[in-house]
């Protein structure tokens, strides 16, 4: 399938929001109060959006092979999580998550348990989430969708650059 820049932007915002929702919900249940798990201003967890776009771009040809698709999603998500963990520790001056107490962890940033989970979520996203997300995105007239995506992109970029 040929994706446009607008498809990729739409998928980025969709998965960044869903990732934020997942992270915030899990943290709120564990801590029994609201915790904003986003790194960007607003309800977004960029690692989810970036990883989903990367998977969409580079794993499309594996759609017909569930095992290889799962392995590809697992590898990409795990690599993204490991890199993001180190980057966020350097620029955020602290660990945003710590899997040190989990079996088969590396640097406390990745572990086999979550790598398998990311692989499963990646397969679900590529098999079902992208279709649903892009169908909803394309319900809006092209001009409205394009302007909205660029405004969102500009707002996130501006607030991120101002914060750093």
What are these regions (language model features)?
Residues 131-140:
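Membrane-interface helix termini and inter-helical loops of multi-pass transporters
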Residues 40, 64-76, 141:
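Membrane-interface starts of transmembrane alpha-helices
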Residues 3, 30-67, 88-130:
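Functional transmembrane or membrane-interface alpha-helices that line membrane-embedded catalytic
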Residues 3-10, 68, 108, 112, ...:
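Membrane-water interface of alpha-helical transmembrane segments
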Residues 9-25, 46-54, 58, 71-83, ...:
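Hydrophobic, lipid-facing residues on alpha-helical transmembrane segments of integral membrane proteins
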Residues 159-164:
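Conserved small/polar residues in nucleotide/adenosyl-binding loops
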């Amino acid at each position: 399938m040929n994706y446009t820049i607008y498809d990729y932007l739409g998928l980025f915002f969709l998965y960044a929001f869903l990732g934020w929702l997942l992270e915030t919900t899990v943290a709120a249940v564990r801590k029994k109060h609201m915790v904003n798990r986003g790194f960007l201003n607003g309800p977004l967890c960029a690692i989810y959006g970036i990883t989903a776009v990367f998977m969409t771009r580079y794993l499309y040809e594996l759609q017909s092979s569930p095992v290889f698709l799962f392995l590809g999603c697992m590898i990409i998500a795990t690599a993204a999580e490991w890199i993001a963990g180190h980057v966020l520790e350097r620029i955020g001056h602290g660990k945003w998550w710590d899997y040190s107490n989990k079996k088969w962890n590396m640097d406390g940033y990745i572990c086999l348990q979550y790598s398998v989970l990311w692989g499963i979520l990646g397969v679900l996203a590529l098999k079902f989430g992208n279709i649903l997300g892009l169908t909803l995105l394309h319900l809006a007239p092209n001009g409205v969708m394009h302007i909205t995506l660029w405004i969102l992109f500009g707002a996130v970029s501006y607030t991120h650059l101002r914060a750093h």
